[in-house]
Amino acid sequence: MEYMVDRRGIPMDVLTRMKIEERLEFLPQTGKEEACICFPYLEDGVMKNMKFRDAAKHFKMVKGAELIPWNIDAIKGKEKCYITEGEIDALSLIAAGLEEVVSVPNGAGGANLQWLDRFVESHFDDKAEIILAMDTDKRGVELRDELVRRLGVDRCKVVAWGEGCKDANEYLLKYDLPRLRQQVEQAAEIPLE
């Protein structure tokens, strides 16, 4: 957990509360067991999947498990929610006091948003405001644009990370938790065309 606290700026109490752990896991990318951060994917408090990530950014999820947004229980019945491109960005927002946050299950790699179909009615249709806190790279922008299209331009806002930051965690590391929260709360409406 040293990596998450020291190199990613996520407080240990947040990691504990969110049930983030570290353990050895076999990763096909390296062909051996690696020390991995484990992100539990829960729905109604029940484990549905687990994502494993090593320090070299190799990822693995449980084979055959359902893809669901990470931290999906946190947004049910809320007026507003935040969507990030990854769990570490979501943890950064949680550390800044923004609890109603989910991460897409598979990053921006590919525009596979099939998981969204199952959750639109139960978790997103009731939202007055959806804040999209995606990465600023090409894939992040494509993901953001597709989420806006699917969730509605009239209720989506977009976070701008500014010069030198591509995502929420980089912003946290460059500045601090209060500034991260302020930046996210200044998300801009999307102009209607």
Give each language-model segment a name:
Residues 156-170:
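Conserved beta-strand -> loop -> alpha-helix junction used to position metal-binding or nucleic-acid-contacting
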Residues 104-110, 136, 161-164:
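Short, acidic/turn-prone active-site loops that include or flank metal/cofactor-
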Residues 142-153:
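Short, aromatic/basic amphipathic alpha-helical patches
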Residues 100-103, 131, 157-158:
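Short hydrophobic alpha-helical runs that function as membrane-insertion/retention elements
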Residues 2, 6-35, 83, 166-193:
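Short, small/acidic-rich helices and loops at N termini and domain boundaries
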Residues 25-126, 144:
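Phosphate-handling DNA/RNA-contact segment within nucleic-acid enzymes
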Residues 83, 125-139:
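Acidic beta-strand-to-loop metal/phosphate-binding motif
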